[in-house]
Amino acid sequence: MEELLREGKSVRQLVRESIDIARTAFELSLLAFVSGDESLCRAVLSAERQVRERELLVYVRNSLAVRSLDDAMMSVSIFQLEKNLSRITDAAADIAMSYLNFKPPLPRYQIVDGEEVIVKLPYKAGHGARLGRLLSETGVIVNVVALKREEKWILEPPLDTVLRDGDTVVAKGSIYAVERFAERIGARVPEPPRGGIVGEFFEIARIVSVMFFLSLSALLMNADWLAENVVELEGVMDEFHAKLENRIISSDLSATAKAALLSSTFALERISDSLNEIVTPVLEDLEPHPILMEIFEETKERISVIEIDEEDAGKTIEELGYHLKGVTVLAVKRGEEWLVMPPISAFRLEPGDVLIVKYFEESESFVEREETREDREEIIEEIWEEEEED
């Protein structure tokens, strides 16, 4: 806390860092649990304190900056976001502790499967290669979430990191992009968990992952309909959670495996509840704080918009090739209609469609070519105005 105070970081910087830490902690907690990696579990635990410290500082700095009732009302979105990012990180730590406490005798996997895959890969391409160079040589974009060297984990390693044989990297991206990256570093993408109770556990983890970025998108766009989708998914999550809970209890798994899975499932439920709370200001018609637009353009995984022009009209999302460049389409705004997670191989785009996209920091130059930052900000402001009129 004292170090953060000395650094004098702004609310914008603190919230941005909290988003990155919470997302990374959530994703790595799942990978740590399913792979049985104790050192990765401990890395997740360290994130809990980091976000809690930032939460307290956000309250202090934002309270000092409030000068009017309007300022206070806009600050609600910041407070709700930061409070629930802290809760999400706490729940991620509980998933890590579920493994550390119970050491469940479950099948081990080195991959978490979803809209994107998160996978542990051994580096075998020789000493001296820089991470950024390796990524550029593959022609695709993945996010290297973490790097393990000996017993130390480095979260979000910089692109100038020099890799060594024996390192372990955690990569995230589309399955095609991750396979290309794995091939370049002399590794192979393992099979993900399929079916069974562990497979069902990761089905609900996928729902939570979708909710994470939809809740941030709803906040950025001030979009009721996106917020309502988060609420609906939270209801789906409740149903899945109850069914999985019964399946775990009635299974023939060992007592420690049951305890670990139940504890982790409860943690996912808490994350789902927190994501639901993040969109509360939107549903209550409270104006979002203007710094949110800047925050979501600066995180490691960013959220913004791209408008479809005549050149790309008629193409499917898959034909745009975004999945190769680390870009995921979360939703499409077509006129007054919102479509969440449309099928990438079947949904055909029309001129004027606005894509709500999530992309890696490394994809910024690609997204900038598709839509300049200035144009993206104008599109978001127009959506804000439309949502306020509705």
Language-model features: locations:
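Cytosolic, long alpha-helical scaffolding segments
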Residues: 1-390
